[in-house]
Amino acid sequence: MSVRGRVAPSQTPSRIPGTVLAYLALTKPRVIELLLVTAIPAMLLAQRGTVNPLLIVNTLIGGMLAAGGANALNCVADADIDKVMKRTARRPLARAAVPTRNALVFGLVLTAGSFLWLWWTTNLLSGLLALATIAFYVFIYTLLLKRRTSQNVVWGGAAGCMPVMIGWSAVTGTIQWPALVMFAIIFFWTPPHTWALAMRYKDDYKAAGVPMLPAVATERQVTKQIVVYTWLTVLATLALALATGWLYAAVALVAGVWFLAMAHQLYAGVRAGEPVKPLRLFLQSNNYLAVVFCALAIDSAIGLPHLF
């Protein structure tokens, strides 16, 4: 037997984990965390108490398939700019760890799987919402808006709001006003969250030709917009208190004051010409959303009486 014949079998297993991890990276697992943080509380609020655990699991599986499919297709569409940006240069397609055709097929399979799974285990509305989310994220945000307008994340962020709609519809089979308010919370939260990160990597966006707001506007203009959307976020969280108990309302109020203070602090620092740390707001905005929706989950699971 030749040396090549003896070495090849031992090399094959070592390549498998890397390939699996590359496909997993296409789904952007960190982005999927938003699904877990928001969908479960939405389901609990819809029921105002306990929800069948199997329904939660099935909804999360369908949601993860949908998010993974959307993210994989996004990676295919953005492969050219991912190669240019330092922050994304290690993504699978940017470093040719996965063939583009395979990534496209992978994304389409996950997309079809999400629709079929949600239709089979929950209801048709949830499956259709998942399909609509993927289509919006890929065609409207990634292909149409992202490279054409500085308001890309404002409108494109609607895709990230859909887990609450899917979670609510999985329980009720309908869409009601609390689901729309939760949609608004995430919709308004997305711009300050994303722009804070983009302030840190604005040179990357400039190099890639992506007109993210921090890449085309002054820091003062950006932070002013961050403050505006932070206020809208907090007001939306307080509006949701009309459908919750006192625990959620109290946490939303305290967390909202804290989030607003951070946004205003960033704006004040820029106005004063001081060095600022926008990445801190980006990281803490994750904590803010998690705290608010965890409070919503607990409030709903306990079944506290409505404030109003």
Swiss-Prot record:
Native organism: Mycolicibacterium paratuberculosis (strain ATCC BAA-968 / K-10) (Mycobacterium paratuberculosis)
Known catalytic reactions: heme b + (2E,6E)-farnesyl diphosphate + H2O = Fe(II)-heme o + diphosphate
EC assignment: 2.5.1.141
Regions crossing the membrane: 31-51, 53-73, 102-122, 124-144, 149-169, 170-190, 240-260, 288-308
Name of protein: Protoheme IX farnesyltransferase
Family in the record: Belongs to the UbiA prenyltransferase family. Protoheme IX farnesyltransferase subfamily.
Function: Converts heme B (protoheme IX) to heme O by substitution of the vinyl group on carbon 2 of heme B porphyrin ring with a hydroxyethyl farnesyl side group.
Keywords, alphabetical: Cell membrane, Heme biosynthesis, Membrane, Transferase, Transmembrane, Transmembrane helix
EC class of the enzyme, as a word: transferase
Gene encoding the protein: ctaB
Localization of this protein: Cell membrane
